Amino acid sequence: MVKGMTHVTKGRSFLGAPLFPLGLFELSLLVFQFLIGMYLNLFVNIPAAISFSRMMSLSVSYDGFGFVMFHMMLGMLIAFVSLGMLVMSFFNGHSPTTVISLALFLSVLLGGINGLLFLFGGQNNINSYFMSIGFILSIIFDMLLIMFVNVGQDIHHNR
């Protein structure tokens, strides 16, 4: 089982080591993002038509604006972390981690872009659906990356 994975570390140090803690950090951010998103869904009434130019005036007029902004900023942090993981895995030179990291980044983008479209596009249910699909795929690909990199680290330490 582990024998086929030895090519990860053959001839060079294992550069995927920072991916493991970053993957755990990203997973914790995704869980926190889910909790904030559920709070917004259940307890905050977002005005039906929000234009980007009107957003700053909403900070005074509606109670949940701070939560919405925090949710958006956390989403941007998640996107930056997943982009960093993609760059690290690319420079690692190991194709499977690069493919998983790319899938993770694209799923984060799917969720984030549809979140923005949901907020600024009249709260269309299809955007909410694709936002949730992006979130679920992000969790799946992040866990796959964590497991894959962890197996590679175990091989490196057992050599």
Language model features: what each stretch is:
Residues 2-159:
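Polytopic transmembrane helical bundles with strong interfacial aromatic enrichment
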